[in-house]
Amino acid sequence: MKTVSASAPGKFVVLGEHAVVFGKPAVALAIDRRFRCNVSESDVFIVNGEEDDIDKHPHVKHILDIHGIDAINLSSESNLPSGAGLGSSAALCASLSCAVRHMLGKSLDSEEIMREAYAAEYYAQGIGSPMDVSASVHGGGIGLNLPDADELLWTVENRGQKWDVCDIHAPEMTFVIGYTGKRALTGPLVEKVRRYRDRNRFAKDIVDEIGTVTLEGIGALNTGNKTELGKLMTENHKLLSILGVSCPELNRLVDAANEYSYGAKLTGAGEAAV
């Protein structure tokens, strides 16, 4: 029986997480850690050699539902920590969509894989933008809702929000990612910010300000101005902290990093990586 393998990278967010859910701009870069999966046809659902209940794996279930499949034999490995803000679930969805499509002899078109992966992410989390899956499928750097973007990859619309996703060419820079060891669930944190923004004008202003900071940061990133970009990343972290998605451990990491860097911020939904 033929086994098909695929892998996809994780990501980190340079600027704009949470605000991007509401259509504000954001920038993310793929990283050199990946989720890898192997799939083959099966009459029962098997994960890493053990028969399992597919309802416990909503991301996987939704991708299989898209293709009208009840079960597969799935094995996986990853050096992306789960719940660390590095897009592990997006990498899972992207790699699984690619592998299943290849197994079925379907097109490996990047946009089709991205749309399947985003549908699975949204199904599992109930909220969110296509930022993570776009970075995972496309690789390199991606921007969302950037003005005057030249290299449009795809446009995604969902529940009144629209995201134009483009390729960006980031100059050579070094980013260091730290991890608190805490696991944070994306869905509840994004929903927490949504409720806060819907009920509080101040929170809406903070989300708008994150969008402004991100636009300023795009200019700094494009010109390779590390000093300005670092300052704006730190400002972005302060705004995210006001929204309530940071934690003492993250704040200590940011404070420590700021002494020896151009700037620092949390990445992803919060409460995990910086």
Where are these regions (language model features)?
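Glycine- and acidic-rich phosphate- and metal-coordinating loops
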Residues: 67-84, 112-119
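Short strand-loop junctions, especially beta-strand C-caps/beta-turns
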Residues: 17, 50, 77-81
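C-terminal nucleotide
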Residues: 2-9, 13, 20-21, 28, ...
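Glycine/serine-rich anion-binding loops at beta->alpha junctions
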Residues: 7, 78-100, 129, 262-274
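Short, solvent-exposed polar/charged micro-motifs at secondary-structure junctions
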Residues: 15-17, 82-86, 155
